[in-house]
């Protein structure tokens, strides 16, 4: 029987709504994909029959968030303000409520099969728009889904949408420190901490929670996995409770990372042995205190026995011993332990060819399968090393049949450009999730394992390291939030395509204009492959500075140390033998069908060849190229593709706001220059090591390049750059004179318009200044203040400045003046004079 509703026509006046609308007008990226831009009249016309009133059945913070959000969305996209319903009557309405509440009034409703957080949206016979779910969080997700459909201009006239999440765990991690820094964060300081204090009243916490909820994220861990034990101090619990309150209205559970040594370091015990009853009691008391303040506290994340973090091995105990003692304290409160499988020895003997970091996660956790309590989740990185641009799927994902597991992805671009390079990671994650591990000799794609159905596990799922910061657009690069959006959409539905996700995000974040949506989504979809091409192809890993900033080329930093990210390049060939027959045996950790494909170089995909096999430079790939020629070709192709991004972006000028356009263009131009740094470093290194020339004559030959050290120098001094491949010719020049230095040469080419490209170094501890003169006329100047991570001259500090459209005549003197600042010595590497093509 259908009951009737009456609705008061109340006007909503909510400060959050006003703030959000102002942020949309500013177009800084603060609103992410929740801009709710106004639809054109033709598109908006299809929503004329949308009810003008909204009612929530219930009285909870989450439902109020849903109602407020829908009003905001309709106001933004359609220019209407929904009335808030209060009583029974005849007029149709948008009705928000859980299924039990909805069915009190709509007893003839035939509800679909919904799981926790799943939702249903449909029009009933009286044109009420029913927005319902099994729980209140699901109603919120349904509301965001409805708002998204309208913002995308999709029809809802015959909507009957049922959506269940693929997995119950859809969490994000922040690696924020109490001092306000963020480990592997590239977008400002922490929104949660500063100077040892918790920023519980920071309004960005609420804004972040709203963004997460809009794409179905249901948990957030707010502090670094390299955890400071003092976060557990009693004085911090009230502030953590305030953050949990902000999260709660958006359906997000708060969790924190804990240090296993806490019972000893802050608890007054002389031990943290997980099998000591006093340690178990300490954890129980601490957990009880947390739940007294935060009844819906989510649980703990644990990193132990890894990279200097103490763990159970200190007492001869296992990860299961450590996880279970905490899990048992959490169990009465329904809390969870996320125990990271990132456990390895970073003091491996590199001289032993059988040592292999890739084997560590499987070796440490597979023997313990079935020994973890049922509220423990093993958090497993997608690959066996460390978030590289390309690595195989972790075999551990298919090996834990009696243990809950979650895949760990990384939104923050630690090894994939640190939000200075465009790198849309969804295509990579799709490959991982679609990969068939053939567990139990049956078809078992990773995405099916993560549902929990493959091995009948109850709390499997997804975790991503995000590391948003105080930058207005959350992740620094205006295009980087596409990775957070894409992660969350895949965690909900891993069968979505990368193309669908890219187009959705672009339309919501920038514009539904087909030119904008097509252009930006096209750039996104090609960017991961582009980044891989100019960094580390063929499974070599990223070839970056692994012992320092994790940014820029530094090939030998991977070798001859204990970190285990070896590529084993020598004068004969490159790659690490991980076969069972002759290598480390890593390939044997996979199920037989997968292991067989990786055991032989002939059946290993080219993209992973050097990860599994040491091969000669003359080895012929499936593509028909030799390994060495592929190295040359891929790096030149990648740099060329990166250069096209800036040109493509310029076709969008005027199609959306100037601020995001200009910031993105500057980053894409920087990426184009840094891709050349990568190209030259890798090609020159392997040219020298292999002694095999580039068949196309590019590597080692740079037409139009003038080395800085060959110019006429005034107070500039020549320096050797280490590693040598990070500067053209292995040398650069720097200025130590406070009032500046200069370098000049005479141009001997044909007169005309040229682009002057200067490869310079930008150090973070100072802002060096540069000026370019042609025939004593100032043609360009800039300050090196791009906030690169570098503290010395090298691959992570090298950038390229372009001065286009400069008229140069034969005999003109070209002079570069540099003025140092602090530790930035206005250094540069070379100049290239490139003819400006007429169009």
Protein language model features and the residues they cover:
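Feature activates predominantly on carbohydrate-active enzymes
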Residues: 59-69, 73, 103, 108-301, ...
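Extracytoplasmic
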Residues: 693-839
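Acidic, contiguous N-terminal accessory segments
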Residues: 22-126, 157
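Catalytic domains of carbohydrate-active enzymes that cleave complex glycans
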Residues: 443-702
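Acidic/histidine-rich, surface-exposed loop or edge segments in extracytoplasmic proteins
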Residues: 45-61, 189-193, 223-226, 621-628
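Catalytic-core regions of glycoside hydrolase
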Residues: 82-83, 195, 199, 234, ...
């Amino acid at each position: 029987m259908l009951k009737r509703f009456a609705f008061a026509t109340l006007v909503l006046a909510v400060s959050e709504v006003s703030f959000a609308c102002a942020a949309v007008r500013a177009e800084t990226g603060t609103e992410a994909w929740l801009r709710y831009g106004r639809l054109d009249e033709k598109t908006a016309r299809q929503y004329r029959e949308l009810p003008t009133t909204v009612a929530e059945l219930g009285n909870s913070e989450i439902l109020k968030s849903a109602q407020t959000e829908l009003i905001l969305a309709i106001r933004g996209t359609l220019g209407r303000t929904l009335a808030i319903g209060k009583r029974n009557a005849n007029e149709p309405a948008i009705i928000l409520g859980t299924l039990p509440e909805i069915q009190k009034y709509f007893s003839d409703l035939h509800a679909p099969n919904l799981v926790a957080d799943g939702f249903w949206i449909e029009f009933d016979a009286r044109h009420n728009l029913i927005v319902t779910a099994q729980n209140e969080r699901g109603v919120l997700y349904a509301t965001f889904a409805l708002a998204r459909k309208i913002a995308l201009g999709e029809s809802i006239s015959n909507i009957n949408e049922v959506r269940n999440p693929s997995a119950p765990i859809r969490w994000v991690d922040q690696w924020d420190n109490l001092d306000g820094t963020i480990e592997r964060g590239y977008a400002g300081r922490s929104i949660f901490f500063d100077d040892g204090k918790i920023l519980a009243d920071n309004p960005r916490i609420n804004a972040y929670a709203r963004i997460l909820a809009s794409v179905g994220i249901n948990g957030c861990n707010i502090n670094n996995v390299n955890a400071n034990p003092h976060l557990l101090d009693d004085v911090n619990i009230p502030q953590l409770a305030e953050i949990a309150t902000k999260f709660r209205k958006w359906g997000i559970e708060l969790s924190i990372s804990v240090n296993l040594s806490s019972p000893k370091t802050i608890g007054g015990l002389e031990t943290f042995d997980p099998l000591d009853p006093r340690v178990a009691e300490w954890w129980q008391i601490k957990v009880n205190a947390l739940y007294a303040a935060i009844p819906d506290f989510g649980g703990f994340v644990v990193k132990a026995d890894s990279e200097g973090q103490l763990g159970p091995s200190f007492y001869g105990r296992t990860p299961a011993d450590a996880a279970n003692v905490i899990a048992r304290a959490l169990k009465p409160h329904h809390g969870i332990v996320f125990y990271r499988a990132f456990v390895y020895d970073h003091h491996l003997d590199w001289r032993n060819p059988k040592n292999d970091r890739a084997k560590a996660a499987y070796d440490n956790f597979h023997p313990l399968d079935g020994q973890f309590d049922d509220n423990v989740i093993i958090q497993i990185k997608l690959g066996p090393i460390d978030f590289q641009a390309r690595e195989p799927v972790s075999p551990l994902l298919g090996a834990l049949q009696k243990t809950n597991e979650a895949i760990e992805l990384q939104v923050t671009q630690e090894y994939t450009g640190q939000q200075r390079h465009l790198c849309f990671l969804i295509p990579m994650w799709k490959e991982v999730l679609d990969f068939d591990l053939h567990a139990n000799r049956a078809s078992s794609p990773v995405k099916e394992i993560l549902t929990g159905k493959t091995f009948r596990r109850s709390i499997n799922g997804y975790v991503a390291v995000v590391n948003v910061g105080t930058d207005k657009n959350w992740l620094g690069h205006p295009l980087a939030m596409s990775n957070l959006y894409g992660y969350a959409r895949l965690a909900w539905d891993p069968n979505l395509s990368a193309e669908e996700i890219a187009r959705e995000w672009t339309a919501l974040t920038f514009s539904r204009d087909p030119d904008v949506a097509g252009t930006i989504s096209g750039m996104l979809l090609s960017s991961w492959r582009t980044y891989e091409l100019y960094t580390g192809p063929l499974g070599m890993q990223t070839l970056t500075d692994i012992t320092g900033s994790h940014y820029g080329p530094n090939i030998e930093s991977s070798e001859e140390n204990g970190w285990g990210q070896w590529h084993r390049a020598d004068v004969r060939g490159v790659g690490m033998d991980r076969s069972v027959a002759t290598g480390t045996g890593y390939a044997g950790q996979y199920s037989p069908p997968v292991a067989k494909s990786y055991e032989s170089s002939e059946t290993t995909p080219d993209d992973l060849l050097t990860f599994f096999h040491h091969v000669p430079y003359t080895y012929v790939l499936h593509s028909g190229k030799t390994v060495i020629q592929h190295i040359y070709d891929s790096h030149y192709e990648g740099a060329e593709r990166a250069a096209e991004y800036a040109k493509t972006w310029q076709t969008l000028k005027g199609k959306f706001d100037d601020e995001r356009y200009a910031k993105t263009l500057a980053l894409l131009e920087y990426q184009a220059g840094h891709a050349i740094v990568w190209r030259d470093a890798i090609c020159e290194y392997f040219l020298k090591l292999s002694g095999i020339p580039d068949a196309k004559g590019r590597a080692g030959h740079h037409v139009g390049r003038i080395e800085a050290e060959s110019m006429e120098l005034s107070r500039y001094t020549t320096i050797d750059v280490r590693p040598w491949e990070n500067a053209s010719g292995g040398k650069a020049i720097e200025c130590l004179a406070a009032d500046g230095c200069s370098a000049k040469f005479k141009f001997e080419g044909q007169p005309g318009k040229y682009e002057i490209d200067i490869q310079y170094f930008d150090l973070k501890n100072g802002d060096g200044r540069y000026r370019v003169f042609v025939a004593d006329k100032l043609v360009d100047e800039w300050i090196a203040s791009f906030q690169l991570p570098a503290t010395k001259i090298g691959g992570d500090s090298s950038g390229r400045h372009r001065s286009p459209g400069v008229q140069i005549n034969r005999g003109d003197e070209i002079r570069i003046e540099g003025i140092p600042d602090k530790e930035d010595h206005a250094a540069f590497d070379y100049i290239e004079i490139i003819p400006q093509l007429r169009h």
